[in-house]
Amino acid sequence: MPRLLRLAPLMLAGTALGAPGMAQEAAAPAVTATLSADKPGSVIHRDVFGQFAEHLGHGIYGGIWVGKGSRIPNDGGYRSDVIAALKAVNVPMVRWPGGCFADEYHWRDGIGATKSRPTKVNTNWGGVNEDNSFGTHEYFGLMERLGASTYVSANVGSAPPAETAQWVEYMTAAKGTTVLAKERERNGHAAPWKVQYLGIGNELWGCGGNMRAEYAADLTNRYAQFAKSANGTMLKIASGPSDSNYEWTDALMRIAGKNIDGLALHYYTRPRDKNWSDKGAALGFPEREWATTMSHTLEMETFITKHSAIMDKYDPAKRVMLAVDEWGTWYDPTPGTNPGFLEQQNSLRDAVVAGLNINIFAHHADRVKMAAIAQMVNVLQAMLLTDGARMVKTPTYWVYDLYKPWQGATSLPITLTSPWYHKDEVAVPAVSASAVRDAAGQVHVALVNLDPNRAMPVTVAMTGLQATQAAGRIITGTAMDAHNSFDAPDVVTPQPFTGAQVAGGTLTLTLPAKSVLVLDLR
């Protein structure tokens, strides 16, 4: 039976109104909210809008990297259209090379002359050949083109600590100072790179080695000890829990908390979550699966709240970040594709899921200081899809475009009382919100209506803010599974929204069904 969700009051105070089936009505009770612009919260780190690129399906090859000899327009082997699209949404950080792939990846396979690099089988994802033509130098070349922070995941599952230590030295040692620095120079890059984040393994409870929490914590201490950046601070991110594995968080924080800078949390939204081989379709789904998707998405609030409470016990100063470095929707693969490639379409439903998650992260900016949606191109809840020379921006991409003002902005308290969206046994608050003040002093408000049928009248009382105008952009559509395709790339795109009014310190509007709206207050 789908779970009934009750959210923490910080995010919104829900008021149950009506009975199941009420979602079919055209009218809706009002949403009321209070925005306290004079009570600033934590800064939302820009890396909360990070991305994830794994050697999986067409996530790297064909999606980002086509090689210098490709007929597809490219800049040194990187797809020109993909680079331009990612830069346009200010991608702040990219995690690489995995994922499960990371704990089978040996960094030396991906350096040196491309023709001399060994070909191996990607046993995690699809059983295809991996020619290692995209390696360390190519990854940093991508980061340089994007102007993004670097997040390298080290192999703990099948490699010794010395391999991680040597990789860090290869990447960060000053020119000419060590044997590995000289090797890097011979391979074409004399200057060292900056590694902002080092992942100490991936999912050590699963594909990273099927470990017990205490054993994983001991290994984390060991690998963290020997991984030393030669050119400044490198934040070490431990392999943390999956969804509600609170015992894992307790063990990692208790045993290794003093030696790490972050703990990774992974959680994927599935419409059907009883059987991993039956997740539900990306398109053509019934409303019930829209509802369960929203309910399961909103569980992120519970997971972050409970994991943060455990972390607070060992780290009351909140030095160790909670890094939600794998999140997003996971559906059954597109029929006819390699199931190991995790290809799926991306619809308006995914846009709403993205907005809900970003709002949750914003409310937990004191602990959640980095996140990475899975994944950036062609895999799972992708920002971009490619097919040969063609590229399309997904609804999720456009949500990231709307939320650009949130990067590095200060979160503002917004409390919300919302009607409930009901479908069969599922009941969830219909509207989610977050608000920020950017570095220039402008206030922005995001509102997400997850009810697919009803528009919501919204009234926001504002304090500490002298706004007189509100305008912005909205993402919505006529169908729950409205999506962009290569033949129709603009079905779901942001549209101007001018239906908001500001008078006497109060913001009023009607929020369309199944929509993500960002308003700029002036």
Where would I find each of the regions flagged by the language model?
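Bacterial N-terminal signal peptides that target proteins for export
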Residues: 1-9
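N-terminal signal peptide c-region/cleavage motif recognized by signal peptidases
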Residues: 18-20
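Extracellular loop and loop/strand-boundary signature of outer-membrane beta-barrel proteins
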Residues: 291-293, 345-346
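Non-catalytic accessory regions flanking glycosidase/transglycosidase catalytic cores in CAZymes
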Residues: 23-262, 300-301, 305-333, 337-522
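Active-site His/acidic residue clusters
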Residues: 268-291, 337
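Histidine-centered catalytic micro-motifs
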Residues: 265
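Bacterial N-terminal signal peptides
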Residues: 8-16
